[in-house]
């Protein structure tokens, strides 16, 4: 019979393997297929979509994404603003052609490599201090540029394999691709598709990893329900602190591995109470699973097993929960007022073009089916930057989530299940969302707060000057191209 430490080790491995397959699919969705080709023998016909699609992730030798390994790190834990997860990238090498320069079976070889951010420039580094969210977007964009390189041999020849590269996964740049991955899973698991064909499609390995993780979580909940409950509580405790305080959580874990809390002096007690808070320290010391792992000298699995929460944040989007977006009552007061004034000046400038014929009988001039297309400047401004009217959520979204509930009931249960969904008319104020999980008590509340906060950041991004500059750049590029014809 396996011990608690063995069970946590198995779950930790499942979490990393699931994340690796998910990040491969995410990068595959993001990169252009032309720059990241697959051979013709990896094309599979999907009878549901009625078209051919790319096959299994691991089946292509000329796939740049498969030249690296991806590992989720401790930087993914805690409140991370709009960051889904943080991961480390290591370039693979061919063992038969590269002399072995480290002892065989060295467990921590990659961890001993020097760390390097993804292609950071001096300007980007300076901007990190003032722009808390911009660094994640820069990292992720530079990672995509590196994977788009045609000559991977050049990457290894330039000694890029000697570093640990790391990058954040920003919600703004990735949530649409994660939603597409969820659609692919549902399409490729349709009962009308033969099992042999479904096993050759693009999400096959991700479904294998999700199945193993689901089975091990379900087995733990049945065989050791007390430990399972303590594990869920441990996820809440470890991830309830801000990201910058995770280093103090690690110090506390290392300290309690060799000493009891009661044996520490009052100065250390006071220091951890001040930094981490009374609630965290008391909950940490009273958790049954944490106590077992500390006493069995397996304290590393407190961190590794807690990485399930950032994985749940990504699966929360894949499984369709993020589509249950609440009504935004106020995106950003200052930015909204500025954009409102800018639009007002724009419409005033072309006021004559918006004047239409007036009549007591409006239906005399307009068809009923076209009424939704008739709006003035006030309506346009309200539609873009004002308070939206609550609309009923498509029933297909609920059915979509329930399909995942049939496939992975334990994982869906951790996200809140499929029996009760948030009200369709719920409203949130983006300026009032706390930047922490402090007042929350269960994992589904953590996930909803992260989703609401990240969605608000996404709305701010698409209305920001940064997006305006990006669009101007694309317009200028298109103009130069058209002028060259």
UniProtKB/Swiss-Prot annotation:
State the source organism's domain of life. Answer: Viruses
Q: Which UniProt keywords apply?
A: Virion
Compartments, record wording: Virion
Where does it sit, as one GO cellular component term?
A: virion component
Could you tell me what this protein is called? Uncharacterized protein R347
Q: What is the lineage of its organism?
A: Viruses, Varidnaviria, Bamfordvirae, Nucleocytoviricota, Megaviricetes
């Amino acid at each position: 019979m396996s011990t608690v430490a063995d069970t946590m080790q198995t779950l930790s491995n499942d979490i990393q393997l699931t994340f690796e397959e998910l990040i491969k699919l995410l990068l595959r969705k993001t990169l252009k297929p032309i720059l990241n080709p697959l051979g013709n023998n990896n094309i599979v016909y999907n009878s549901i979509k009625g078209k051919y699609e790319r096959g299994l992730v691991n089946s292509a030798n000329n796939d740049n994404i498969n030249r690296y390994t991806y590992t989720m790190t401790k930087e993914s834990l805690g409140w991370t603003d709009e960051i889904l997860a943080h991961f480390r990238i290591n370039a693979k090498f061919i063992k038969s052609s590269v002399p072995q320069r480290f002892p065989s079976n060295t467990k921590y070889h990659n961890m001993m490599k020097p760390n390097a951010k993804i292609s950071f420039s001096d300007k980007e580094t300076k901007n990190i201090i003032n722009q808390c969210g911009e660094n994640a977007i820069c990292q992720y964009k530079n990672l995509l540029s590196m994977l788009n390189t045609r000559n991977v041999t050049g990457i290894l020849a330039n000694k890029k394999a000697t570093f640990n590269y790391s990058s954040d996964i920003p919600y703004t740049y990735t949530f649409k691709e994660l939603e597409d991955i969820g659609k692919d899973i549902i399409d490729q698991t349709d009962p009308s598709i033969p099992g042999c064909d479904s096993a050759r499609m693009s999400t096959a390995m991700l479904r294998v990893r999700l199945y193993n993780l689901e089975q091990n979580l379900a087995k733990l909940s049945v065989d050791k329900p007390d430990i399972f409950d303590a594990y869920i509580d441990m996820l809440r405790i470890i991830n309830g602190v801000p990201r910058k305080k995770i280093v103090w959580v690690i110090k506390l874990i290392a300290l309690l591995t060799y000493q009891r809390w009661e044996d520490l002096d009052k100065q250390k007690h006071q220091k951890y109470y001040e930094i981490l808070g009374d609630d965290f320290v008391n909950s940490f010391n009273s958790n049954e699973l944490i106590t077992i792992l500390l006493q069995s000298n397996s304290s590393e699995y407190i961190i590794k097993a807690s990485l399930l929460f950032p994985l749940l944040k990504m699966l929360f989007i894949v499984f369709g929960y993020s589509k249950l977006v609440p009504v935004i009552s106020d995106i950003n007061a200052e930015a909204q007022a500025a954009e409102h004034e800018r639009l007002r000046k724009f419409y005033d400038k072309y006021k004559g073009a918006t004047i239409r014929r007036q009549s007591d009988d409006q239906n005399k001039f307009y068809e009923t089916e076209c009424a939704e297309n008739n709006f003035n400047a006030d309506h346009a401004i309200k539609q873009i930057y004002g308070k939206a009217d609550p609309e009923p959520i498509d029933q297909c979204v609920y059915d979509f989530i329930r399909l995942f509930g049939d496939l992975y009931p334990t994982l869906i249960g951790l996200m809140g299940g499929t029996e009760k969904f948030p009200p369709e008319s719920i409203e949130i104020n983006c300026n009032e969302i706390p930047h922490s999980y402090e007042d929350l008590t269960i994992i589904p509340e953590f996930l909803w707060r992260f989703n609401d906060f990240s969605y608000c950041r996404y709305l701010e991004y698409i209305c920001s000057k940064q997006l305006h500059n990006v669009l101007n750049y694309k317009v200028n590029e298109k103009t130069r191209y058209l002028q060259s014809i």
